[in-house]
Amino acid sequence: LDKLVDEMLTYARLEQGSPTLSFQRIDLDALVNQVIAELAPLRANVAVTRGQCLAASDNDGAWVEAEPRYLHRALQNLVSNAMRHAESRVSVSYQVGQLRCRIDIEDDGPGVPESAWERIFTPFMRLDDSRTRASGGHGLGLSIVRRIIYWHNGRALISKSKNLGGACFSLAWPRQQEKP
């Protein structure tokens, strides 16, 4: 129940007007490692690994401007969702270019039918019987992800995983945020 209340409060905060975001320069590589370290032990039969991680060629590493708490939450929601639906593998990759960055979370589960790609981000949406309260989902996680990335001037996308065959959820946003 506490988790549901937390999800609802987070969603309400992100949905109402413009939340106060404190954009900071963060190391995307470190964030990916942190989320994998936090979540990988929770489901021993699913291997959560880093996929291809490419940083900009400016010798400046994988830094991006983001609100650290919210970007962490978005990545955590996507990885835990992928783990819940994976058969045995989840992969987290990123690309940081000069102007834009992208994170891809792929799994080897059944995937999401293309006909449901847009509505999967709808609050309280569950596509099948595997997405029940018993599986740990409340139907708000992907809605929260979409709102978080919206406030970063980006997009949350879904496609079929080219590498693992299941779903691929992607976050894409500007590497630097516009100053107010």
Show the residue positions of the predicted features:
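Short alpha-helical Gxxx[C/S/T] motif in the catalytic ATP-binding
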Residues: G141, V145
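Glycine-rich ATP-binding loops of the HATPase_c
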Residues: N153-K160
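Acidic ATP/Mg2+-coordinating residue in the GHKL
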Residues: D107
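Detector for a conserved hydrophobic position within an alpha-helical segment of the HATPase_c
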Residues: I149-Y150
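A conserved beta-strand-to-alpha-helix junction within the catalytic ATP-binding
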Residues: S22-A37
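Conserved micro-motifs of the catalytic ATP-binding
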Residues: Q16-L21, N59-A66
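Short conserved segment of the HATPase_c
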Residues: V112-F124
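Short beta-strand/loop element within the Bergerat-fold HATPase_c
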Residues: R89-L99
